[in-house]
A protein has these predicted regions:
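Conserved catalytic alpha/beta core of Sir2/sirtuin-type deacylases, generalized to analogous enzyme cores
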Residues: 1-314
């Protein structure tokens, strides 16, 4: 995971990363009802909540990258490029498309399906209801804009990995991103045989080269001014609340990019006796045993867990 040199005057985001896993992970054996009760009590009694959300949160909310949602909506792409390669939207994003017309033929549809077309989903709106009267901040690796749609204050969200709604210079020749909603709509209407017309292929307004999605996948990811400002606000929030009672509410964060949310959250709990961790995860709800009562690991259906916690918090 590559984070670039920090611009002068901005917080060094790398200070908040952590690559050290716990050595004492356990699956808690507490009854589900007891875990929900404890989680709700911790949230009710805390000064502030820091939400850390990974891909599992949006999967639980209903944004499925595979299965019927993929095969129904991307049938022409599966037929054209082969089911061996087109197994789901994640794999399709890494396919070596033979042309810019083909690349944007895919990505315009992907962005519309996962960023622009879905409304605010219940898991996210219920999560907002839980924290809206608290001091809160959201740290997320998701790029689907669900937190914004659900009503969270955009000044309290740091989306570290980009945005499906933005594009950038493929070689990052300048530190700026561009809103692509209208362009993607045009591409979607004009697409034929998985390809968009050549006249719709975006070109960098500075160097004239190809454009790319604003997603962190290599060293060319553009961290624009808004990205750095969000990082600064997150750093400020941590500093302002370091001596308060804080709940770290982690949702759907696995071991794909754990250095951004999972390991840093554990580090904060180790270093701050007034911090506690609530970890919701379908299959990886392990928590450090040494955290004792300051950690709750809730496995299974995250959407149900959020609903149940909300029922006890409000």
């Amino acid at each position: 995971m590559i984070f670039k040199k920090i611009r002068k005057g901005h917080a060094d985001w790398r200070n908040f990363l952590c690559s050290t896993p716990a050595r004492d992970y356990v699956f808690q054996k507490d009854a589900y009802e007891d875990q929900i009760d404890r989680a709700a009590k911790n949230i009710r009694n805390t000064d502030c909540v820091i939400i850390g959300a990974g891909a599992g949160a949006s999967t639980a909310a209903g944004i499925q990258y595979g299965g019927k949602r993929f095969t129904d909506n991307f049938a022409e792409f599966i037929k054209k490029y082969g089911e061996y390669y087109m197994t789901d939207m994640y794999a399709a994003g890494f396919y070596p498309y033979p042309s810019e017309e083909a690349k944007w033929g895919y990505w315009s549809k992907h962005a519309l399906m996962n960023r622009f077309d879905p409304p605010a989903l219940p898991l996210y709106t219920e999560l907002y209801d839980i924290v809206k009267n608290k001091e809160y901040f959201v740290l997320t690796t998701n790029v689907d804009h669900q937190f914004y749609k659900a009503g969270f204050d955009e000044k309290r969200i740091f989306a570290t990995q980009g945005d499906y709604g933005k594009i950038q210079c493929r070689k990052a020749c300048h530190p700026k991103t561009y809103d692509a909603k209208d362009l993607f709509r045009k591409m979607d209407k004009a697409r034929r045989d998985c390809l968009i017309p050549s006249e719709l292929v975006p070109k960098c307004p500075v160097c004239g080269g190809n454009m790319a999605m604003n997603l962190r996948c290599d060293n060319y990811f553009v961290e624009d001014e808004a990205w750095h400002e969000a990082a600064d606000r997150y750093a400020g929030f941590l500093e302002q609340n370091k001596d308060k009672k804080v709940v770290l509410l982690e949702l759907g964060v696995g071991f794909n990019t754990p250095i951004i949310i999972r390991f840093p959250f554990e580090k904060m709990v180790r270093e701050n006796s007034s911090y506690s961790l609530i970890r919701l995860n379908m299959d990886e709800a392990v928590v450090p045993e040494s955290f004792g009562e300051r950690a709750i690991g809730i496995g299974g259906d995250m959407a149900k867990a959020i609903t149940d916690i909300k029922g006890l918090v409000l």
